[in-house]
Amino acid sequence: DSIKKNARKKFIDENLCQKLIENEKFVYLPLHQEPERSLLLAAPKFSNQLETVKEISKILPENYKLYVKEHPTQGPARNWRDIKFYKEILKLKNVRLIHPDFDSKLLFRNCELVISVGGTSSFEATFFGKPSLIFADLGYAIIPSIIKLNSYSELQQGIADCLKMKIEPRFVLKYLEILERNSFVFDILDFEASYQNKFYVNGNLVDVKFHEIDMRQFLNEHKAELDRVAKEFVRKIYQFNIIRTNETSD
């Protein structure tokens, strides 16, 4: 595995772009780390990322390139993809495959449009004043500059609509206000770090066997914060049921 991983990284370093082409218009597509919830659960119909790249490539306007960036944690967390995957993308004439270490902010800042299956990239795009297309059902899709697609057949019209779109920051601010009203304090980064340290040797292992006694110990150690999360979820369920009841009665 180590030899394979090093060979794949060598191919990435030697073949993936590490700079922007001056005055080149492009659509930005960040790849998801695989396997990942954003693909397998949120958008299973679109979990084949190579197919997504090819479908976008087919209908991209002639004066645009598609910049596809490898996920920076794909290698460290899950091993780099098979070299065949990268070669298939490199064959596409209107596609540039971007190195995982390249600064994503430069891509957000200079692109005309962001396309993402799911995840947070399309939400990030709004802070750079960029429109975006997504395939997953995500809460932030209520922002008008984010268009949800249900099939690849909607790509061409979606791209055309986004490229004509004028972004209004007030809608992003409204969404952030909604988030603030419906949020609660929970240090998820600290919780995930504790989880990784307990079960994955500080994130250095992937395929590990869980033991019941270790899980019980972990849950007991974090009982207070998990109880708080559970109460907030129950509160939200009650709120949703009240709203649904009122809508039904109307």
Provide a role label for each language-model segment.
Residues D1-I83:
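Conserved catalytic-core segment of nucleotide-activated headgroup transferases in glycan assembly
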Residues I12-E14, N23-K25, Y152-D250:
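C-terminal amphipathic helix plus adjacent low-complexity
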Residues E34, T73, S121, G139, ...:
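Short, glycine-/Ser/Thr-/acidic-enriched flexible segments
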Residues R96-H99, I146-G158:
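Short acidic-hydrophobic, aromatic-tinged amphipathic segments that line or gate anion-handling sites
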Residues L41, N48, A77-T120:
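Donor nucleotide-activated moiety binding/catalytic core segment of transferases
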Residues P100-I147:
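A donor-sugar binding/catalytic signature common to diverse glycosyltransferases
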